[in-house]
Amino acid sequence: MNILELSEQEIVRRQSLQTLREMGIDPYPAAEFPTNAFSTDIKAEFKDEDEPRQIVIAGRMMGRRVMGKASFAELQDSKGRIQVYIARDEICPDENKDLYNTVFKKLLDIGDFIGVKGFVFRTQTGEISVHAKELCLLSKSLKPLPIVKYKDGVAYDKFDDPELRYRQRYVDLIVNDGVKETFLQRATVLRTLRSVLDNAGYTEVETPTLQSIAGGASARPFITHFNALDQDMYMRIATELYLKRLIVGGFEGVYEIGKNFRNEGMDRNHNPEFTCMELYVQYKDYNWMMAFTEKLLETICIAVNGKPEREIDGNIISFKAPYRRLPILDAIKEKTGFDCNGKTEEEIRAFCKEKGMDVDETMGKGKLIDELFGEFCEGTFLQPTFITDYPVEMSPLTKMHRSKPGLTERFELMVNGKELANAYSELNDPIDQEERFIDQMKLADKGDDEAMIIDQDFLRALQYGMPPTSGIGIGIDRLVMLMTGKTFIQEVLFFPQMKPEKKMPQSAIKEWEEIGVPEDWAYVLRKAGFNLISDIREEKAQGLQQKIGEINKKYKLGYEKPSVDDIQGWINAANA
């Protein structure tokens, strides 16, 4: 990287880096630095009457106040922040005071990692702090952090642009309070979920992410190519069909927590790569699964929040069992006045069009009902509500309802206006399943790119016999959103999918060279604000010479100054 591509602060930091090395200080030491305390523990366990506690801590320097022979630094470790008192003659007991006067005061920067050995004390202002006896550099930072400043209770220079926060999550975690806590709560959600399932006797398993058939859900898959087999493969859209194979194989209950991939849109509730938990238990039905799900979510909410409720968007959402249960067709009738019972595909499509919905001939009856529910019903269910008994056209992997012809034993759990879980009494009739797959292929022939493909191996597994089974899929990212009160899925993903980063248009160095500009001077031109060759077309040669000469002098580059005639040649070539 050319030095002129760096900011002023980055250049200064690299100069400090070089000076440290010249002083014999390794800015990136390899040796272990064992610590024995965290900032939060130091504060919580401090007692004025105790003997001073000897501690070794390490962390990122987030602030510094230099006051002659004594200074204060703010150190941030993985748990929190603590003040460090640094006295020149304490860390430099002999005649050489370079560690304090040069290294600490001049060469260290905000963002550097330091190690401190010393003891705990309380300052005259009452702040629990660490009195440094030894100090060392553990890692030099080369980019300046965006440091939030406060004045009269107002924050300035906040790092709060969502795109920057999501793209540079590592910076977000450093400078914004509460971000790390969200991801620690996510870990609590997963840990509690596993604990409940393990204690119930169910086995965590892993199934293929690369699949030859994208089955188990209605979604558009990502496609890749497996060179060794010269075969197209799919990133899985669900784990369902492989987990059911394991139920066929004799497991009582299996679950998987893993990534699924759907080649669809991105918004505040959807990411193309997402985490899902699927659970399948033999000899159970969807009624049992509703009761199990209620207790599971109540347990998770208590683990995260200390109580079975959470405030989201100003609404108190209660996860305390039991939840309301409402058939989907009743929900549509309740919200629209239209009764889908007994209606044909054409009648439902006509009603959708009457309501101004964007529907077409490729949509079958199930898809139309799904669109109706999404348009008029889904967003209205704030409290946890089981939407049950879906039409068979919407549920190709679900057992027919035991008492309601044309419907299936399926539920979706709605919370805060969004789907959180999807569950069935699983279809285990191999003949019925094959017929459902064939119906799905007919939808695909009509243009539905989310219709399921026939999975012949799954049908073969069913033919060996699968016991009565209930299964559920829970979107972990949405679950974490609910448990942490976040309204954007990007807030609970460390690194959400982003659009390509916008970059300032620049002419390539090679393009500058093609019009006669030497490589070194091409970087100087960029530093002077001429990013495109077209930017110099209206410049006067003498004025341009002065501008780039100032850059040459400021950064002590020592380049031989081009003549006015040389620069005029560049301008002429740019206008050619």
Feature names for model-found ranges:
Residues 1-504:
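Class II aminoacyl-tRNA synthetase catalytic cores and aaRS-like
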Residues 501-576:
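Compact, charge-rich alpha-helical regulatory domains located at protein termini
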